[in-house]
Amino acid sequence: MLSAHGLVKRYGALVALGGVDLEIAPGEAVAIMGASGSGKTTLLHCLAAIIPPDAGSVRIAAPGAPTVELVGMSENERSAARRSLLGFVFQEHLLLPELTAVENTPLPLLVQGVPRRDAEAHAAAWLRALGLAGMEERRIGQLSGGQAQRVAIARAQVTGAPLVFADEPTGALDSHTSADVMTALLDATTGQGRSLVVVTHDPGVAARCSRVLRMRDGHLSVEVASR
């Protein structure tokens, strides 16, 4: 699914990534942990084509599709790759508060030119699958934090992206809601044969993943089997 080799990222004299190698299989959930400043978010951003590394390669091989090399693409090409291959869930859900759940969720499809009626029907199906039946017409401000994150998960999955990146997806939630949201995230990704990469400080979240990787000073220093 994803293969990264020799990733290097520098910010002036600071080496944020010092030559990282990583392989992620289809249907696998991988957690990346580490102290603040260890390089884990920089790694996620390079893997997800949000920022380019200074050296190295990142290849994505979606089932039934040719392998795509993300490094060396123009910004427009990276943007197109993100839309077609990747989904994103962040600690701050980044939903538009003036829109309802069923209006927020299909936005990636609308950008791809899918007719609004079809996009919203597909979005509503994802919202129901994630336990939000009856809440499709509620504005984001009318939802709890956990419900809003479920909308964000639905939005990340609505295009059928084979690989999802989540940066502290439960960081703003209490422990009970965090567990529920993580269950929804896993059901929507690995439960559908898709891959998931999660950056987290929460050992409980990491323990739900197939593998736990630990970042230290820009290197993946430890790999621990989780479940």
Segments predicted by a language model, with ranges:
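Conserved ABC nucleotide-binding domain
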Residues: G72, R116, E120, W126-G141
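Short coil-to-helix segment of the ABC ATPase nucleotide-binding domain corresponding to the Q-loop/switch region
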Residues: L99-L107
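ABC ATPase C-loop
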Residues: L132, A156-Q157
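The feature captures the beta-strand-to-loop junction immediately N-terminal to the Walker
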Residues: M33-A35
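Helix-to-loop junction immediately C-terminal to a conserved catalytic motif
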Residues: A48
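ABC ATPase NBD coupling module
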Residues: P66-G87
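Conserved ABC ATPase signature
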Residues: R139-L143, Q147-Q149
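Conserved signature/switch motifs of ABC ATPase nucleotide-binding domains
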Residues: R138, T159, Q192
